[in-house]
Amino acid sequence: MITLGMEEEIQIIDDRGELVAHDFSADFVEATIPEGLMDKEIHRCVIETKTRVCQTVPELLSCVRLMRGQARRQAASQGQRILIAGVHPTSTWQQQPLHEGADFPHYASLIDEYRDVSRSALSFGMHLHLGFELGAPRMAIMNRLRHVLPEVLALSASSPFFEGRDTGLQSWRHSLLDRYPRMGTSDAWESEQHYQAHVDRLRAVGCLGEDQGLWQDIRLHHRYGTLEIRIMDTHPDPVRIGLIATLLKWEAETLQLEIRAGRQGPVWSRACIDENKWRARRHGLRAQWIDWNRDTVSDTPKHFERWWSRVAPRAKDPAERSYWERHLADALIQRTFADVLRQQALRLGDWKTTLQWMASLACDDAYVPQAAEALA
């Protein structure tokens, strides 16, 4: 049994659609409910939501929807709204207040160490936690789960614009985050003991605080013991989130079976994975993907068909398999939210209208998938 949990970083906007500081000194509107809890982040224009531990993907999506509703109500209590995307298209980081000073020692220490790297990393991700039973080969799974992280980045890509400019990328968010140390693609580790020994060394020489872990695209969480996948942009469509969670859960289950049967394949280097990560950041679901086991390149339909064939046997029944197969096919037709956002910005013609459209997608069950083939 693999359990699931989700964290989302949600943008707080004003009536113009621009990022705005939220007053976290005021009481949260039911900050902790059975489905999860809300928290602050380093930038005051962010609400972070955290679901409870979930047993299934449908349960996870129910909690994600309910936590987004909580964030909407929290924002509305101060006349604000929410927006869901990996980067805000127009707001500038220099204008965003931070949680700093003596009242926020954790964030103050980050700002003191990383300076404008932390101030300017105005990004919004979603983190999927996979929880394993005692004795599961978590590090062996993590080493190989790294291989498919660029694919889920492509499925989630939602940050083509930055400070009013089209960056030419599908996910600009990683251009902001990868400036941090101990960020990006994880190394492969021989064992959990070797991984923990490295973390302990970093703490001993002052690189990490006692309650800090690595910030890489996937990590063994230092408190929860989960595998935390951190590579994804936030995405307005809960169904796309469900597809990503399903693929990662089934891939982890497949890896666990292979490892226990002694059939695991080779572990790819960080350098090899970074090649596919760049392709995902640049081209999204139009990327040409490298299979480093074969040294071959394939287009997205063929590549994802091969991945689907690998993990689909993990479905609990034909109905579940058919449901997610249909949504994967839809995703490959619709392309990324970055594609759709570019198309809408061009069609609507100005940022104010585009931001209002984006905000409307964060309303309850308001997201209607749109194909973006015209931008090919």
Tell me the role of every PLM-derived stretch:
Residues 88-91, 159-170, 263-271:
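Short proline/glycine- and acidic-rich turn/helix-capping motifs at secondary-structure junctions
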